[in-house]
């Protein structure tokens, strides 16, 4: 791992990846997977997120650590594409996660009326 990469936080990595996704969004669908996904529209992106979520669940059920990491990375990547298509920034999601740190999940659900 390079020194720059080792100094990057997880949030920095997500932001950098989201920025790359935004840059590639307007590229040619012939040369960019991200552009191809965006050209297919939100429903196709959501289908892909669902597929990747299923693969992550299957990997976790199988118990192979490397597969769990690989499939979760795919899921997170496609979730970032979904956020891009939905006009939601990584920072909005990170802020929501930060808000939840230290808060009981049961309290969170109760506050939402679930």
From Swiss-Prot:
What EC numbers are recorded for this enzyme? 3.6.1.31
- Under the cellular component aspect of Gene Ontology, which terms does the record hold? cytoplasm
Q: Which GO terms describe its molecular function?
A: ATP binding; phosphoribosyl-ATP diphosphatase activity
From the UniProt record, list the reaction(s) this protein catalyses. 1-(5-phospho-beta-D-ribosyl)-ATP + H2O = 1-(5-phospho-beta-D-ribosyl)-5'-AMP + diphosphate + H(+)
Signal peptide span per the entry? Answer: none
CDD domains assigned to the protein according to its UniProt record, in alphabetical order:
NTP-PPase_HisIE_like
- Major subcellular location class: cytoplasm
GO terms under biological process: L-histidine biosynthetic process
InterPro entries the record matches:
HisE (IPR008179), PRib-ATP_PPHydrolase-like (IPR021130)
Pathway participation: Amino-acid biosynthesis; L-histidine biosynthesis; L-histidine from 5-phospho-alpha-D-ribose 1-diphosphate: step 2/9
Q: Which Gene3D superfamilies match?
A: MazG-like
Top enzyme category: hydrolase
Q: Which UniProt keywords apply?
A: Amino-acid biosynthesis, ATP-binding, Cytoplasm, Histidine biosynthesis, Hydrolase, Nucleotide-binding
| Localisation | Cytoplasm
Describe the family membership recorded for this protein in Swiss-Prot or TrEMBL: Belongs to the PRA-PH family.
Sorted alphabetically, which PANTHER family does this protein's record hold? HISTIDINE BIOSYNTHESIS BIFUNCTIONAL PROTEIN, HISTIDINE BIOSYNTHESIS BIFUNCTIONAL PROTEIN HISIE
**What name goes with this protein?**
Phosphoribosyl-ATP pyrophosphatase
Species per Swiss-Prot/TrEMBL record: Halorhodospira halophila (strain DSM 244 / SL1)
- Which gene produces this protein? hisE
